[in-house]
Amino acid sequence: MDKSKQLFRKSKGSFRRRLPPIGSGDRIDYRNMSLISRFISEQGKILSRRVNRLTLKQQRLITIAIKQARILFSLPFLNNEKQFERTESIPRPTGPRSRNK
């Protein structure tokens, strides 16, 4: 084979297959908070199926379980614990307001 063609050939490397995040024994239920909390972001949003690496059926069941837990108040709708901090305060003018025309 030509040297120029050899440079563009892809090497066939091995890849590690990831384990599914939900085991066969795990029960998807609104009471199983340890399982549900893995699929919620820090802000309290439900993570997408691509991020979770779930099947369509599992994602649907997780979504329903999260929504049931939110309705029964075992899970908050929003996570407001994160406080926003200002790094630098901007001084505000204290005098009368001026109009820009």
Curated annotation (Swiss-Prot):
InterPro entries: Ribosomal_bS18, Ribosomal_bS18_CS, Ribosomal_bS18_sf. One of its GO terms (cellular component) is chloroplast. The keyword Chloroplast applies. Keywords: Chloroplast, Plastid, Ribonucleoprotein, Ribosomal protein, RNA-binding, rRNA-binding. The gene is rps18. GO terms for molecular function: small ribosomal subunit rRNA binding; structural constituent of ribosome. The lineage of its organism: Eukaryota, Viridiplantae, Streptophyta, Embryophyta, Tracheophyta. The keyword Transferase does not apply. Belongs to the bacterial ribosomal protein bS18 family. It comes from Acorus gramineus (Dwarf sweet flag). Residues 1-23 are annotated as: Disordered. Residues 1-19 have a biased composition (Basic residues). This is Small ribosomal subunit protein bS18c. Part of the 30S ribosomal subunit.
